[in-house]
């Protein structure tokens, strides 16, 4: 018997509950065949203008404000110390809050790429310094989005 895993958005099993299904298949010694399709993570790196040689995807950051600010500062430090692009996502209804937190936690010269609705109608991918974003953040409520920071 065969089965497939399809993701509603993004790539199955990457920051997706499909990973649980794949883990079960691996434990049962079933053959797993990944198929190539669009990955918003890779597409956002490609469109950002950031380092595509060294990058890290962190999934969802902490919700608690203090922990989130601490994590954002840690990721920004990795940008400058390791020259590594940092990627993360947020639940769409919290995107605007995430952008505000990035603006508060990170340096004005740090670059932020906002990649939203990738491969969909209304696709939005822009890279600017935080100083350039100030006062001009888009409304991303209820839109799938990836955030990337770099120097």
Predicted regions: what they are:
Residues 1-2, 81-151:
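A contiguous loop/helix-start segment that scaffolds small-molecule binding in enzyme catalytic cores
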């Amino acid at each position: 018997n065969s089965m497939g895993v399809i993701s509603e958005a993004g790539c199955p099993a990457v920051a997706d509950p499909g990973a649980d299904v794949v883990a079960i298949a691996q434990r049962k010694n079933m053959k797993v065949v990944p198929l190539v399709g669009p990955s918003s993570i890779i597409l956002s790196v490609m469109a950002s203008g950031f380092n595509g040689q060294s990058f890290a995807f962190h999934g969802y950051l902490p919700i608690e404000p203090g922990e989130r600010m601490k994590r954002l500062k840690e990721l920004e430090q990795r940008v400058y110390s390791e020259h590594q692009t940092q990627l993360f996502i947020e639940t769409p209804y919290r995107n605007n809050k995430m952008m505000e937190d990035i603006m508060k936690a990170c340096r004005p010269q740090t670059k932020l790429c906002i990649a939203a609705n990738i491969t969909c109608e209304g696709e939005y991918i822009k890279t600017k310094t935080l100083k350039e974003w100030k006062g001009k953040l888009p409304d991303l409520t209820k839109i799938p989005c990836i955030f990337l920071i770099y120097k």
